[in-house]
Every structure is written in C-alpha cells, then in structure tokens.
C-alpha cells in the first residue's frame, strides 16, 4: 500500500472466507470481512483509483468491492452467474468521469459495475460458459474492444458493439489470447492452439501477421 512495501496477501478459501496476510505470513489485525455467500474461485483483485484502494472479488453470483480493511466500499445489488474463466478488470473512463470493473457471466453478457454504484450490461452474442473474455484497446484508437474466444471462434467487437472481425480455428484453443504492444498503434494478439501445435498472431485489423500461423 502507498508504495511503502506494506504488502498484503489476500487468499480466498473453500470456507467462504477471505484471509489477509502480511509479508511475514501473519494474519493482519483489523481485517473485518466475514465471508462470501458462496465459494470464490478467482484470485482477489487489487485496484487503485486516485488515492483509494479497491479489493474486488466475486463468488458464484455476487460481486464484492471492499476497502483495504475488508469493509464494503461500494454496495452492489446486481447478481449474475460469473464466468469461471474470467476475472474482473479495471476500466477508467477516458474523460476521467469514472471507473468500473468489467467481467462476463456464463452466457457471455458483459457486466460493467461502476464505482458510482450503477451497473451496465452489454449482450453481443450468446457464448458458452467456457469462453475467454478481454476488454482492451486492440488498435490504439483509445477506445476499448470486446474480445471473445469461445471454442474455435474468435470474435472482436468495437466500442459501438459492432463486429470488427472474426476468425474460426480448425481446433479449439484452450488458453486465453495474449496481447502485445510494439508501439502506440502497432498492437497484436496471439493465440496458441495446442491441438494443432500452432501459434497464431493477429494484426489489430484481424488479419494474420505474415508468416503465421507457425
């Protein structure tokens, strides 16, 4: 916290409790969070916005946004079945108007939970519960893209929720895409297809980079 090397480790356990440890491995005094409603299957996230720390985690249906002591920082009333492969990511509005965390449910609906307490949902298509989702600026235009890898389908939508490009693999990749930035506008996305023993590298327009797959 506060760049003073006062590190904390937050561990979600099967007993539905979140344990807070210091860097020596001792339980932290003053940690007040009691328990979640169901088991947490993803790591606890730490985000810092301005001078405030946000600990964000989700159980099967509920999202929790806490302060560093385990108190509720933002109350959320939205319940949805969380996708097991996708954790929360932080999104800061370009105009500085606010922040939100973003994730998907088991059908691929995108849920924005704003730090103001409001929520927003975007449905682009219907996906399986094992999809991968990322929310990134893929082409350097300072606008975010919705990126889905579901089975053997790769689909990328722009900020206006229009399909930018798609690609169908012969076999289904089993790991999430990896993103590379070589310059402000030169950004690429890599996908490993283990069953084909091939690596795919996509330009930000959806075309395969020269020489790929390899």
Where are these regions (language model features)?
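Extracytoplasmic/lumenal domain signature
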Residues: 1-214
């Amino acid at each position: 916290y506060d760049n003073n090397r006062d590190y904390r480790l937050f561990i979600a356990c099967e007993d539905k409790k979140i344990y807070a440890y210091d860097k020596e491995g001792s339980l932290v005094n003053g940690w007040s969070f009691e328990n979640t409603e169901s088991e947490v299957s993803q790591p606890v996230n730490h985000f810092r916005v301005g001078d405030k720390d946000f600990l964000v985690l989700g159980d099967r249906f509920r999202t929790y946004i806490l302060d560093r002591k385990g108190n509720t920082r933002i109350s959320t009333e939205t319940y949805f079945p969380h996708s097991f492969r996708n954790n929360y990511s932080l999104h800061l509005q370009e105009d500085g108007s606010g922040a939100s965390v973003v994730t998907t449910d088991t059908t691929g609906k995108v849920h924005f939970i704003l730090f103001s307490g409001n929520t927003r949902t975007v449905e682009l298509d219907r996906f399986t519960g094992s999809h991968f989702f990322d929310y990134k600026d893929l082409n350097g235009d300072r606008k975010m893209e919705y990126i889905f890898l579901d089975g053997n389908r790769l689909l990328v939508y722009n900020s206006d929720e229009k399909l930018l490009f798609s690609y169908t693999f012969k076999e289904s990749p089993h790991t999430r895409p990896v993103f590379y930035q070589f310059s402000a506008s030169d950004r690429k996305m890599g996908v490993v297809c283990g069953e084909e023993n091939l690596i795919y590298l996509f330009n930000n327009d959806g075309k395969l980079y020269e020489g790929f797959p390899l």
